[in-house]
Amino acid sequence: MTRDRDFLTSLTVNLGLFSNIVLAALKTSIGILGHSPAVLADGINSTSDVVYYIAVKIFMKQAQKPADKEHPFGHRQLESISAIVVGAFILTTGITIFCESVNTVYELIIGVETGRSASIWALSIALATFVIKLGLYFYTRGTAGKTHNPTLRALANDHLNDIMASVAVIIGVV
């Protein structure tokens, strides 16, 4: 069972990592080329997702080590530590998105910033992100339920956070 659990966990983390790499590259490029600060900010968010997915991979690899003299019960507690790391990233991302949103609304109200029309590419990548993250959320949540892995539960919540950010980007682009 442990081998199946480790395989499912690794597969889920790798799928999320690959998806975030692709989304980060696309959103950052389209945000720049499509003149959409909202999509660019979402691309930077996806880049930070890549960074902590790499950290999660390292934690998960270490958590799979067998028990030894110094750790007679094994290294599985690293999964909980990894979940805390993901939670810290989610909290930081949420605070950053909130602050940027308040700042943008303030600038629109006082007239410093004016609304701009973004390209169809910006809207397309925002919609694609919504669909991809929705799929990743349900898959990761399901795998977390099967494996009882706290890190996967945290990653599922991060996908949910990204879904909400994508909705905000879609609204901002439209």
For each predicted feature, which ranges?
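Alpha-helical transmembrane cores and adjacent cytosolic helix/loop segments
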Residues: 1-174
